């Protein structure tokens, strides 16, 4: 029988451990602080930011939110980041993507103090990840790594196909999977929009991680029996519902479930782990910057 992996349950377990570490820091006079910066009028981005701030508040992390009009200059955003870099009450900084077209994304990522880069996207932190000495692992790949471990899925010696090569998920996910140690030691193939015969690659995989942002691009015919399927995608598609749309992943859940040994749903799969690992990184940042030792889960 196929196991439907409950991301909410695993995320809650991790968050509970992070909350205990937050209590330890607070008892030593250190209140972890996360600053979110939104330079967009996009409703979905506003929702994501509010979810992250609410999660922080629930475990005692102080939230600081900065809203910048999408019409403002890049310098307005850079000035805000500079202020947050210098603020000792702020241990983590998250600029919600995407930013407007007139703002260079790379410059935004490089502007954040790497010690406060809790997304793990600053070039220094990317380099540390590739070198096997990560300071902050990117939240979604780290969450998937935790999810696989909690579900009892061993990656060592397994063939893993990552579908998608984004800087946010695909590339760091592949880097984590090939590294030495628990959650790594996998033989990893990265597929993308130019991959020939994607189905041939996915059928030969023990684990498929779908992160291409294409609705239901992977179905049961592209999987072998017993595969573990991790669906990172979250896509709005038109539907005959009250809202006029429904959320689907990059995997056709119903057909894939017939083949998979374990599979994540959308929503309720990877998403809760992404937020849990943001809290994890924020508390780790507070520990590193304050010198107060903690034992994260």
Curated annotation (Swiss-Prot):
The keyword NADP applies. GO terms for cellular component: cytosol. One of its GO terms (molecular function) is methylenetetrahydrofolate dehydrogenase (NADP+) activity. InterPro entries: Aminoacid_DH-like_N_sf, NAD(P)-bd_dom_sf, THF_DH/CycHdrlase, THF_DH/CycHdrlase_cat_dom, THF_DH/CycHdrlase_NAD-bd_dom. It catalyses: (6R)-5,10-methylene-5,6,7,8-tetrahydrofolate + NADP(+) = (6R)-5,10-methenyltetrahydrofolate + NADPH; (6R)-5,10-methenyltetrahydrofolate + H2O = (6R)-10-formyltetrahydrofolate + H(+). The keyword Hydrolase applies. Pathway: One-carbon metabolism; tetrahydrofolate interconversion. Keywords: Amino-acid biosynthesis, Histidine biosynthesis, Hydrolase, Methionine biosynthesis, Multifunctional enzyme, NADP, One-carbon metabolism, Oxidoreductase, Plasmid, Purine biosynthesis. NADP(+) binds at residues 164-166, 193, 234. Its EC number is 1.5.1.5, 3.5.4.9. Gene3D superfamilies: Leucine Dehydrogenase, chain A, domain 1, NAD(P)-binding Rossmann-like Domain. One of its GO terms (biological process) is purine nucleotide biosynthetic process. Belongs to the tetrahydrofolate dehydrogenase/cyclohydrolase family. NCBIfam families: PRK14167.1. Catalyzes the oxidation of 5,10-methylenetetrahydrofolate to 5,10-methenyltetrahydrofolate and then the hydrolysis of 5,10-methenyltetrahydrofolate to 10-formyltetrahydrofolate. Homodimer. PANTHER family: C-1-TETRAHYDROFOLATE SYNTHASE, CYTOPLASMIC, C-1-TETRAHYDROFOLATE SYNTHASE, CYTOPLASMIC-RELATED. This is Bifunctional protein FolD 2. It comes from Haloarcula marismortui (strain ATCC 43049 / DSM 3752 / JCM 8966 / VKM B-1809) (Halobacterium marismortui).
């Amino acid at each position: 029988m196929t196991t439907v992996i409950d991301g909410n349950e695993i995320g809650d377990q991790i968050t509970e451990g992070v909350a205990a570490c937050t209590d330890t820091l607070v008892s030593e006079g250190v209140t972890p602080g996360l600053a979110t910066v939104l330079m967009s009028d996009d409703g979905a981005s506003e929702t994501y930011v509010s979810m992250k701030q609410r999660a922080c508040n629930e475990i005692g992390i102080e939230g600081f939110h900065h809203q910048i009009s999408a019409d403002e200059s890049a310098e307005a955003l850079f000035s805000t980041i500079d202020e947050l870099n210098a603020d000792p009450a702020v241990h983590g900084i998250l600029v919600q993507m995407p930013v407007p077209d007139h703002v260079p994304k790379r410059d935004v990522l490089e502007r954040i103090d790497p010690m406060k880069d809790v997304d793990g996207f600053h070039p220094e932190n990317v380099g540390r990840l590739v070198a096997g000495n990560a300071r902050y692992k990117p939240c979604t790949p780290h969450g998937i790594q935790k999810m696989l471990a909690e579900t009892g899925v061993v990656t060592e010696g397994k063939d893993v196909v990552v579908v998608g090569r984004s800087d946010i998920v695909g590339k760091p996910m592949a880097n984590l999977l090939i590294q030495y140690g628990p959650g790594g030691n996998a033989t990893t193939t990265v597929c993308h929009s130019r991959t020939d015969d994607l189905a041939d690659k996915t059928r030969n995989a023990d684990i498929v991680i779908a992160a291409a942002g294409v609705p239901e691009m992977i179905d049961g015919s592209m999987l072998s029996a017993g595969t573990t399927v991790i669906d990172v995608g979250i896509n709005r598609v038109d539907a005959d519902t009250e809202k006029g749309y429904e959320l689907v992943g990059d995997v056709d859940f119903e057909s894939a479930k017939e083949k998979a040994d374990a599979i994540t749903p959308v929503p309720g799969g990877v998403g809760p782990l992404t937020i849990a690992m943001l809290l994890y990184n924020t508390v780790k940042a507070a520990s590193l910057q304050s010198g107060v030792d903690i034992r994260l889960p």
